[in-house]
């Protein structure tokens, strides 16, 4: 008898363990957002602690966090450092796993005060949730008194969301009873993607070295070297190296302070730096900076201010560490026409990062790069540096093309991949054509090989423009499925009614969904998938803005996150067992379509 009971128990365990083997492909194995990112908060007078318990295999994006108070004044919340995550479409972004705690200091709050918090996350398996917003009630507190003690308007115990959070059923996420849930603001690329510039702090070092060889900077180094040495030509090598290094550190101090100020200001505007109109504005600024590097106009400090700074620097005594350091610090404030545009571009990069360490470190490396040739000249003389000539103007123009790449990077987020490719093509053709024409004056034999390479690169870069002007090959013309967009429950019902007699596939898409981009690029472009979908009505919902209408549609369809693809039969009824959640490659999706149509 005991043997039979043990056997029965083992059979039951094995049944539950292997049940997943027979699940329909594409069925959701993802939990609701409230379970993936369990949110909690506690308030003790002026201190509010926001915490997220993040399920294994899921993560939150740092750049998607926003905080706003109504009826209260708060300090800017300080998010901890996360880990770096990279994907094909949106590059590097900072994410949080496991557990996240964010302290918020409430300076003062009214009785009806609230704190609105927005976040967004994804699963490693290729599934992204819409932005979540919680409105938290705050206990009323007055501003701290002169003796530093907080004063509560009402003697209230700590506020916590713990009693309100019961795990929702796996069918649909439900908000906590005590918390009001509102739709999140629009997000232009996902948090992994707030339009992060393709730049790192180490690039600043290389840019600084390059700027040193422009016509506004390199000819000044012999004069600066003499001033640093105090007119003394017979200093020991160690003494000359020390003075040059101190001068560069003084210059670096000014730039580092500027980086810290801009990064601190950037913390207040990170959310704004994700909106399309801001990206367009930044692109226009970068284009103007690039044009200044091409010599169309000059960007620099007013001449009167430059004169005052120069006179102040000249009053400092060269040859002494203190005087040399002060001269370097003042020199950092004098922006020449060649340094203004690259410096402005770096400052915009720092502002959109909002990271103090990154801001200070980036401009320190930039100043160090500019100072390295000065150190070499001060210690070894002119023999290690190239002679001045027309080539310095070419270096300046080349930096103009580098800066011009930044608006292309930003605008392709708004215009889409196709226009982005065309813009990169235009930039490539312009750069390689300029480099080819510039090299024609060279007389050295090996430059002929360089000219051939530049000409070939220009022709290759022009390919997307040729396809645009003369038409892409047939294979590329049928690369994308033609979806009909619907934006509400009523429009969806109407489209299903009009499609009576035909099967329907509904794709839910958003710009912040990386796996949606993968579906578009790798799956929907497959000839096998396109062939299998012939005779199927293709509908698509874009929920990028996460508007109330989008939220209502997702709730109506019981969709947890994206990508999600729904299938309807000829009678307009959803076949829920065929629903796809998460990314599927072309082969798996083709097989899924065949099973659906069988």
Curated annotation (Swiss-Prot):
Q: Which PROSITE patterns match?
A: THIOREDOXIN_1 (PS00194), THIOREDOXIN_2 (PS51352)
Regions that span the bilayer: 197-217, 242-262, 277-297, 330-350, 356-376, 391-411, 423-443
Q: Compositionally biased, Pro residues: which spans?
A: 165-176
Enzymatic reactions: [protein]-dithiol + NAD(+) = [protein]-disulfide + NADH + H(+); [protein]-dithiol + NADP(+) = [protein]-disulfide + NADPH + H(+)
**InterPro entries under this entry?**
Cyt_c_assmbl_TM_dom, DsbD_gamma, DsbDN, DsbDN_sf, Thiol_diS_interchange_DbsD, Thioredoxin-like_sf, Thioredoxin_CS, Thioredoxin_domain
Region of interest called Disordered, as start-end residue ranges on this chain = 147-187
Q: Which UniProt keywords apply?
A: Cell inner membrane, Cell membrane, Cytochrome c-type biogenesis, Disulfide bond, Electron transport, Membrane, NAD, Oxidoreductase, Redox-active center, Signal, Transmembrane, Transmembrane helix, Transport
- Leader sequence segment: 1-19
Pfam families per the record? DsbD_N (PF11412), DsbD_TM (PF02683), Thioredoxin_7 (PF13899)
Q: Which compartment or compartments is the protein found in?
A: Cell inner membrane
Cystine pairs annotated here are: 122-128, 216-338, 513-516
The keyword Transport is annotated on this UniProt entry: yes
Q: What class of enzyme is it?
A: oxidoreductase
The segment(s) forming the Thioredoxin domain are: 459-598
Q: What is a GO molecular function of this protein?
A: protein-disulfide reductase [NAD(P)H] activity
Q: Does the keyword RNA-binding apply?
A: no
**Topology of the protein relative to the lipid bilayer:** Multi-pass membrane protein
The protein's matches in NCBIfam families, at most eight in alphabetical order, are given as: PRK00293.1
What PANTHER family does the entry give?
A: THIOL:DISULFIDE INTERCHANGE PROTEIN DSBD
Give the protein's biological function: Required to facilitate the formation of correct disulfide bonds in some periplasmic proteins and for the assembly of the periplasmic c-type cytochromes. Acts by transferring electrons from cytoplasmic thioredoxin to the periplasm. This transfer involves a cascade of disulfide bond formation and reduction steps.
**What name has this protein been given in UniProt?**
Thiol:disulfide interchange protein DsbD
Q: Please tell me the species this chain comes from.
A: Klebsiella pneumoniae subsp. pneumoniae (strain ATCC 700721 / MGH 78578)
* GN (gene name): dsbD
């Amino acid at each position: 008898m005991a043997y039979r009971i043990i056997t029965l128990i083992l059979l039951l365990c094995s049944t539950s363990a292997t049940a997943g083997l027979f699940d329909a492909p594409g069925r959701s194995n993802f939990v609701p957002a409230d379970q993936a990112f369990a949110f909690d908060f506690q308030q003790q007078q002026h201190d509010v602690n926001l915490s997220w318990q993040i399920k294994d295999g899921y993560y939150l994006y740092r750049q998607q966090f926003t905080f706003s108070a109504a009826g209260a004044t708060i300090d800017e919340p300080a998010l901890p450092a996360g880990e770096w995550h990279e994907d094909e479409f949106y590059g590097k972004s900072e994410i949080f796993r496991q557990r996240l705690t964010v302290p918020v200091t409430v300076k003062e709050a009214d009785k009806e005060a609230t704190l609105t918090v927005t976040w967004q996350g994804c699963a490693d398996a290729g599934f992204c949730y819409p932005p979540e917003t919680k409105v938290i009630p705050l206990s009323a507190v007055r501003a701290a008194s002169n003796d530093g003690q907080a004063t509560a308007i009402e003697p209230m115990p700590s506020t916590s969301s713990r009693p309100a959070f019961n795990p929702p059923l796996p069918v649909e996420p439900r908000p906590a009873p005590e918390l009001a849930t509102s739709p999140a603001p629009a997000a232009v690329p996902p948090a992994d993607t707030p339009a992060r510039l393709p730049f790192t702090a180490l690039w600043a070092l290389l840019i600084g070295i390059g700027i040193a060889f422009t016509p506004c900077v390199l000819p000044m180094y012999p004069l600066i070297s003499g001033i640093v040495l105090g007119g003394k030509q017979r200093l020991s090598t160690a003494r000359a190296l020390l003075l040059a290094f101190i001068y560069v550190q003084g210059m670096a101090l000014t730039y580092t302070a500027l980086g810290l100020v801009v990064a601190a200001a950037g913390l207040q505007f990170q959310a704004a730096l994700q909106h399309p109109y801001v990206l367009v504005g930044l692109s226009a600024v970068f284009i103007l900076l690039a044009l200044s590097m091409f010599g169309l106009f000059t960007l620099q400090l007013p001449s009167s201010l430059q004169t005052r700074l120069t006179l102040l620097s000249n009053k400092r005594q060269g040859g002494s560490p203190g005087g040399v350091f002060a001269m370097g610090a003042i020199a950092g404030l004098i922006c020449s026409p060649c340094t203004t545009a690259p410096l402005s571009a770096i400052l915009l990069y720092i502002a959109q990062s909002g990271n103090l360490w990154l801001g200070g470190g980036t401009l320190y490396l930039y100043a160090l790069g500019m100072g390295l040739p000065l150190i070499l000249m001060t210690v070894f003389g002119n023999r290690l540096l190239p002679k001045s000539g027309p080539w310095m103007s070419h270096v300046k123009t080349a930096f103009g093309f580098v800066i011009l790449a930044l608006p292309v990077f930003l605008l392709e987020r708004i215009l889409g991949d196709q226009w982005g490719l065309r813009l990169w093509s235009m930039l490539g053709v312009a750069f390689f054509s300029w480099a080819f024409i510039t090299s024609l004056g060279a007389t050295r034999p090996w430059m002929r090989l360089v000219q051939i390479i530049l000409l070939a690169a220009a022709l290759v870069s022009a390919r997307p423009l040729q396809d645009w002007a003369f038409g892409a090959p047939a294979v590329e013309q049928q690369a994308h499925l033609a979806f009909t967009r619907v934006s509400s429950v009523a429009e969806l019902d109407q489209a299903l009614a009009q499609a009576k007699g035909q099967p329907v596939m509904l794709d839910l898409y958003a710009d912040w969904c990386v796996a949606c981009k993968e579906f578009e690029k790798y799956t929907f472009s497959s000839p096998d998938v396109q062939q299998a979908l012939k005779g199927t009505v293709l509908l698509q919902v874009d929920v990028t803005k996460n508007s109330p209408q989008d939220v209502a549609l997702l709730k109506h369809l019981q969709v947890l996150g994206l990508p999600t693809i729904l299938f309807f039969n000829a009678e307009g009824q959803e076949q829920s067992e065929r629903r796809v959640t998460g990314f599927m490659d072309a082969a798996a999706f083709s097989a899924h379509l065949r099973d659906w149509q069988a």
